[in-house]
Regions:
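Predominantly the C-terminal beta-signal and adjacent terminal strand-loop region
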Residues: 25, 131-192
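Outer-membrane beta-barrel channels and translocator barrels
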Residues: 30, 69-73, 106, 145-147, ...
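Cleavable N-terminal export/targeting peptides
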Residues: 1-31, 184-192
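Residues that define the transmembrane beta-barrel architecture of outer-membrane proteins
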Residues: 31-33, 54-60, 91-95, 130-136, ...
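Glycine- and aromatic-enriched membrane insertion/assembly motifs of diderm outer-membrane
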Residues: 34, 51-94
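Transmembrane beta-strands of outer-membrane beta-barrel proteins
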Residues: 33-37, 76-78, 111-115, 149-153, ...
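Short glycine/proline- and aromatic-enriched beta-strand/turn motifs that initiate or cap beta-hairpins
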Residues: 24-67, 192
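Transmembrane beta-strands of outer-membrane beta-barrel pores
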Residues: 41-45, 82-86, 117-121, 144-146, ...
């Protein structure tokens, strides 16, 4: 598991970094790539079929992102993020890889949605939880024009059963609120 996770993290990092060429100014063409960092607050809980109530876990997330323009309004945004999830007294820490399709409005606002795969890296009891968590992410963000700084609000809706020790299906559900910075936001970085 750890060997596979190291390979996957390395692969995603290589994809985000390789192929970056020259910086130019102007509108972003297809293939324009911007790298960034992000971090913020998580508010997560576990939802299950038996409606057992869990107290919310407030944690944090921290990660890297790649912003790949398809044209002036559409982009893909793959990310590599550490995320503290689960619920109070049920700590589940993941490395998440969301791949979002993003629509960019001319005023700096963006809407986004896409799948996310999470790899459990630590928990209170590893034997009780599945190592992979699939989710759907939807959200909005705002980039301050010509600065690269932005704010992001996202909802992550767990799709897969995180509980492997019971017949009761349990999923992660959470809201993330945070800040991000896109390096070289004023310039184009074109893939060759």
């Amino acid at each position: 598991m750890k060997k596979d996770m190291k390979f996957l993290i390395g692969l995603v990092t290589a994809i985000l970094i390789t192929g970056v060429a020259s910086a130019q100014h102007g509108n972003a063409p297809a293939g324009h790539v911007t790298l960034g960092v992000k971090g913020g607050v998580n508010m997560y809980n576990i939802q299950n079929d038996n409606n057992i109530s869990y107290d919310q876990r407030t944690g944090y997330y921290l990660g890297l992102l790649g912003h790949i323009h398809r044209n002036n309004h559409w982009a893909f945004q793959p990310e590599l993020v550490f995320s503290a999830q689960g619920a109070k007294n049920h700590n589940l820490d993941y490395i998440n890889i969301p791949v979002l399709l993003q629509y960019m409005f001319d005023n700096g606002f963006r809407i986004q949605a896409g799948p996310q795969v999470g790899f459990l890296i630590s928990s209170d009891n590893d034997n009780d939880y599945n190592p992979i968590d699939l989710a759907l992410s939807v959200g909005v963000s705002y980039v301050v024009p010509s600065t690269g700084f932005g704010i992001d609000l996202r909802y992550n809706h767990g799709l897969s059963d995180i509980n492997k020790s019971s017949d009761v299906k349990s999923t992660n559900r959470g809201i993330q609120l945070g800040l991000f910075y896109l390096f070289g936001h004023n310039s184009k970085i074109v893939l060759r």
